[in-house]
Amino acid sequence: MNIVENQDDINNFIDCVIDISHSVNSDYWNGEDVMGIFFNEFNRYKKKSESGQVFTPEHITSFMYDLIDVSYSDKVLDATCGSGGFLVKAMANMIKEVGGINTKEAENIKKNQLFGIEFDREIFALACANMLIHKDGKTNLEQLDTRETKACEWIKSKPITKVLMNPPYERKYGCKKIIENVLENVPIGTKCAFILPDKKLEKDRMGNLLKKHTLESIIKLPENLFDAGITTSIFIFETGKPQNERKVFACYMEDDGLERVKNQGRHDIKNRWAEIERYWLCLLFTSPSPRDGLL
């Protein structure tokens, strides 16, 4: 994928951002996906991302972090990490839980608990810059193809406990193969949350996947969440445990409270998201409501 016509320009820009970051105190940042914002601004002036890359809104990365109950002790993987949005959000939340950036635990989180893979060379550069901006040494970021054996072996060698991902949707990039490889190579019992197009992993197309792993929940997301016009859902799996007769909890988050602002994308201008997020987390951590269902 060519983010801009001249790759030297984007490399120079990233270098400038990193240089500026050395003069900025990012200790109190909350895991903002700085380079993801940069990428999306460029893509607003392009017809369509050639690689199917659609970066995840910040409020959804935070929601998914809570949805699978990630904590400071977890080892988090994003095997299609894009600009690193899930990883910087996880890093910020985990460091906050251990008492801040200056703790010994915070240093361990940055060096040993965040793992990312990105196939696209230019996007990988964004992820590295993003982690550097947030004072992380990009220790566990790799430029690999999650569809291939080398990436599978790399994943298998890591002590992953949670997975947060929004893989590229284009058919030629093998979204289903990516999901299968992740589920097959993380430890048994790993909780995984994937954002996928609604029809990408319908139950009748999963086949052997559910013979090995459990699909716990499907949360349909608002239809206008992504500018690309793709309708998506969050699929939550637990690895290494066959589905058998277990039911799948399904629900529809019709509204996230954000509104489109001209030339600025979608924003929570009425501060509705916090209450909406609390409602859905409460619903998903308790019994199903009458308005929602089990598949």
Name the predicted role of every residue range.
Residues 1-44:
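Long recognition/docking surfaces used for binding and targeting
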Residues 20-28, 45, 49, 71, ...:
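Short secondary-structure junctions and interdomain/linker hinges
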Residues 21-24, 42, 68, 186, ...:
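Generic structural signal for hydrophobic core residues of well-folded globular domains
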Residues 36-59:
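Class I SAM-dependent transferase core
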Residues 53-172, 176, 189, 197-199:
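Conserved S-adenosyl-L-methionine
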Residues 143, 155-157, 162-287, 291:
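A conserved structural/catalytic subdomain of Rossmann-like adenosyl-cofactor enzymes
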Residues 294-295:
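N-terminal low-complexity segments that are often proline-rich with Ser/Thr-Pro
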